[in-house]
A protein has these predicted regions:
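His/Asp/Glu-enriched, well-ordered alpha-helical/loop segment
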Residues: 1-80
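C-terminal cap of metal-dependent C-N hydrolases
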Residues: 55, 68-113
Length: 114
């Protein structure tokens, strides 16, 4: 409905899950998946979660896109979330996380140096 009415939609979830009840951290990605089920493309949903959210927060000069001078948290996944958003749900697909300029997860395969 929001899409047909050209309403700007951001992404956000206060519930990150509770492992004690079988809800992993990836529960937050459920919203992304539901937006795809509602008719948005995976790339539209990724844009909502990044660029659109920055605009809604009036912080697009600081966040939302990877550009020189902007703050950046970076997520590198094994898969193509722009084609299948579900790859973001699986922690084993998350290979590299950079937060506030620091690597907080590095599951990249290491290659030997010649």
């Amino acid at each position: 409905m929001a899409r047909k009415a050209h309403i700007t939609v951001g992404v956000g979830c206060d519930f990150l899950g509770d492992a004690a009840f079988g809800c992993p951290y990836s529960e937050a990605t459920l919203e992304l998946e539901r937006l795809c089920v509602a008719g948005y493309t995976p790339m539209e949903v990724i844009t909502m979660a990044t660029k659109v959210n920055a605009r809604l927060l009036q912080m697009e000069d600081q966040l939302g896109t990877l550009e020189t001078g902007k703050l950046a948290d970076v997520l590198l996944v094994d898969g193509k979330p722009d084609e299948d958003i579900r790859v973001l749900r699986r922690s084993d697909h998350v290979k590299l996380v950079i937060q506030d300029g620091r690597i907080v997860k590095n599951a990249m395969p290491h290659t030997a140096k010649a």
